[in-house]
Amino acid sequence: MSEALTIEGRKQRARFRAWHRGTREADYMIGGFFDRYHATWSEAELAWFEALLEEDDVDVMAWALKTQPTPTRFQGALIERMQELDYVDIPR
């Protein structure tokens, strides 16, 4: 039970960090990705996202937009999902 709480606590912290990046564009991209997919993440996927949050927003956005190659440590299904950009909801 405490392990589940730990994972939920990590997800809460990750959500805050995903939505408070410093620019609105990064908030929508990274926060929107978190909101769309976090509910089904395994512990390994959550760890991947936590590591991604440590990277500079400019780099993360460049990887998501495919304007720079994604480093090997972030390659895989999650970055491919992020590159689809179908989760970005821009309020009008």
PLM features: what roles do these ranges have?
Residues S2-R92:
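Positively charged, polar, low-complexity stretches
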